[in-house]
Amino acid sequence: MAILKGGVDGPISGLVGTVVCYKLGDNNIMRSRMRPRSKNSWSESQVLHRKRISCVGSFWKSLAKNPVRASWRAAAGLWPGYSLFLKTNLAAFSADGSQIDLEYLHLSTGRLPLPHQLTASVSGGNHLVWKATWLNDSDKGLAKLNDELLVMVVQDGKFSPLLSTGAKRGDQWASIQLPGEERTVQGIYLSFASGDKSSYSMDQFFAAG
């Protein structure tokens, strides 16, 4: 059943035949209703695809309390952050979703550019200390001198919260001290955020080697 909100001239909300109507921000959205299907009607590739999407969804839920979610909400605008996360990261998951390619995975996204020639590597053989360098391009586009360098750590298959390094884009380098145990560090994701945290960049992964 559909409801007319605001009288006969108002938007429709609900189900009209096989069409679902709803409001998203200032936009009125119409989409086809999904038809129920029996369990045995799915092909093998469809079953795998559903498992893959389910795994992406589970990964997204694991970031529920992680500050990095703010980057997806900011970039997605009116749409749910998960929709953009799924579109961006589906290719990083294996066919059945059981494996993740860390180099293809993105934990942060947004309009801010990453600086040119961003590099990061373990410093002095200690996997808990990294050195990052980049070129200062704060005179171009949205980039600003006070954009903050952020890091997420992958340790033993687990992802840390989004952490501040204390470094700014204008510094052109940073020494990053990671939490946790050295032997479990698989790599780090580096990204930038504006000073007021209203804009973020997509991140880049660096393996510990």
Where are these regions (language model features)?
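Charged linear interaction tracts used for macromolecular binding and regulation
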Residues: 75-209
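Long, polar/Ser/Thr-enriched low-complexity segments
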Residues: 1-115
